[in-house]
Amino acid sequence: MIKRFVFGKPFDTEAIINKPKQEEGNIPYFEKNGNTFSYEMDDKDIVWGLGENVRGMNKRGHKYTSWCSDEFEHSEEKQSLYGAHNFFIIDGKTKLGVFVDCPGRVDFDIGDTEYSKLYITIENSCFEIYLLEGSSVISIVKEFRQLIGTSYIPPKWAFGIGQSRWGYGSEEDLLKVQEGYRKNNLPVDMIYLDIDYMDNFKDFTVDSNKYRDFKSTISKLKEDKIRVIPIIDAGVKVEDGYSVYDEGIKNGFFCKDKEGKEFIVGVWPGKSVLPDFLNKAAARWFGDKYKVLTDMGIEGFWNDMNEPALFYSEKNKQEVFEHLAEYKDTNVGLYANFAMKDAVNLMANNLKDYKSFYHETDKGKICHADVHNLYGYKMTKSASDSLERILGKEKYLLFSRASYIGMHRSSGIWMGDNKSWWSHILLNLKMLPSLNMCGFIYTGADLGGFGSDTTEDLLLRWYALGVFLPLFRNHSCLGSREQEPYQFKAVDKFRGLLNLRYRLLPYLYETFIDSVKNNEMYGSPLGFVWTDDEDAKRCEDQLLIGDSIMIAPVYEQNATGRHVYLPEEMKLIRFKGSEIIEEELMGAGHNYIHCNLDEICIFLRKNKKLPLAKEAASIEDLDWKDLTYIEY
C-alpha cells in the first residue's frame, strides 16, 4: 500500500509518474516536529537504500545529506556524493519504504545521533513523503519502482568493454588505445573521451588541431566495431563568437542572479554560464546541440560536472581575494593560516553561490538551492529527449554523474570519481543494490579507480567485480598511472577476465532486461532473499546477480581468497580466465574459498542454470544463440 502526504506546495520533480491520491491527517509511523520527522527503530532494524552513498548496504549508524555534490574523496565520513536518492526501506518487524520527494536539501540521521532514532530533516517547507507498506523488502522495491517508472535501457553494445581516461587528447591517442587492445587480442567496444577532445573545453566542439578529421576517425573506429563516447559538461564557456554561448545569451537560456544578469561561474573553461535546464525551452535547445556530435557518428555520451560543480563564482572569487589581501602584510599565525586556507578551499561548490542564482520555470522564478538536486537530472533528460528524437529509443548510450530519482528513466549513472583504493571495490559493490532500489539499473564503477595510481593486482580484482556490472568501464585521471590492461605484464590474465565478461553476457543482459521490465533487482543483498537468515541479512560483501548466481569478489590486497557465506547449498563454478576449471557442490554455511588473481568464483543456486556464450572480440561478434549451459 502506498500513502502520499503533501506538505505545502511542493515543486513537481517528476520523479513519480503515477501519483496516488493525497492522504489526509497526520503522517503515521513518524513524530513530526517542524520539518523534522523521527522514527523509533528496533535494535535489529536494517535500513536499506539511499542510492549512491558511502558506507554499507545497511545505512544505519551514519548521517547522510541529499545534496548533489562534486565530491572527489569517497571516504567514510562523507555525507553526500553526486546523487540525491531519497528512498530507503526500514527492514524489521515493520517493513516500511520511505521516499522524500524534495529537490532541495534533505538530511537523514540514521542512528548516528541516537542509535535507536531515525531523523529526516527537510530544509524546504514544501515537499511530499511517500510511505510504502509491504510484506517484504522485495515487494516494497517493486511497488516503488512501479511508482517511478521504467528504467533506461541502452543498446546492447553498451554492455561491452569500455576504455576511458582523462588524457586521451588526440586522434593518435585514440588509435593507440585501439591498437593496444587489438594487438593484445583484448575485446573492446567503446573508447571514451574526457574533456581533452574539446576546443578549449567548449561543449559541442572538437579541437581540430588534435583531431584533424574527427568524423573520419569515428567512422574508422566504428568499422572496427568500436564506438567513441565523448563527455559533455554542464558549464558553457563565456566567449563571444562561440555559438552555444551566443544563442543562449540571445534567448535568455542561462541561469541568472537576482538582478537578472547571467550568473558567472568558473569550471574547466574558466568563466562559464549554466544552462537553465528547468526552463523547458532552454532544455530542448541544449539537448538538440548533441546533434552536432551525432552527425559525426557519435552514438553515446556521458554527462559530467552537472551537480552543478562550481570552481567559484565570479562574485565569490572577488570576495575571497579581498579577504586574502587583508593578510598580506600581517604576521600569519595558526588561526589566520587556517582562515586563509578555508577561504580558498571553500570557494568551490559554495552554498552561498547555489543560493545566488535562479531558474525560470513554468511556476515562475525559483532559487537554485530549492531545486538543486534536479540540475543533473534535467540536463540528462534534455539530452535523452533529443537523442531519442535523433537516434531512436534504446539506440543511444547515456549516463550521468549527478542524478535524482526520475532520471533513471532517461539514462544510467556511473558511481563517480573513486580512487585506486582496495576499499573502493567493496564500496562499489555496496552501491549497486542501493542504486537498483532507486531505479538505476545501468550503472558501474571506474574500474581500477579514477584517482591515484592503480596496481596490477588491484585492477584484476576490480575487474572480477566489474565483469558483473551492467556498465563496464576502466577510467583514470590525468596524471595517474596509465591503467589500460595492456600496460601490465599480466595481460593474459586480463584477457581471460574480459573474455569471461562476454561469455556471461547472455545471462547478464537477460537479467538486466528482466530487472527493468519486471521492476526487479539486478544486484540484491542476500538479506532480500533469505529474509529469516540473520547471517544473510548482515552480509555486506556478497551479492545475488539476478536470481541464479551469487558473487563474492576478493577485495583485500594480497588475499589468496576470502570468507563466503552460503545461505543454502550451491554449486561453486571456478573460472580461470574464461574457462571453467572446477565445479563443486557446497553445503550451506560459512566457507573459506581460495581464489587466485586470474580466477572468478560464481555460486550457482539449485534448480538454476547459467548460459555461457563463446568468446568474442566485441558485442557485434558475440553469438547470443550458440550457448552452453551449466546447471545445478
Give names to the regions the model predicted.
Residues 31, 41, 50-52, 91, ...:
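Glycine-rich, histidine-containing beta strand-loop boundary motifs that form or position
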Residues 63-68, 81-84, 175, 283, ...:
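Short, hydrophobic/amphipathic alpha-helical packing segments
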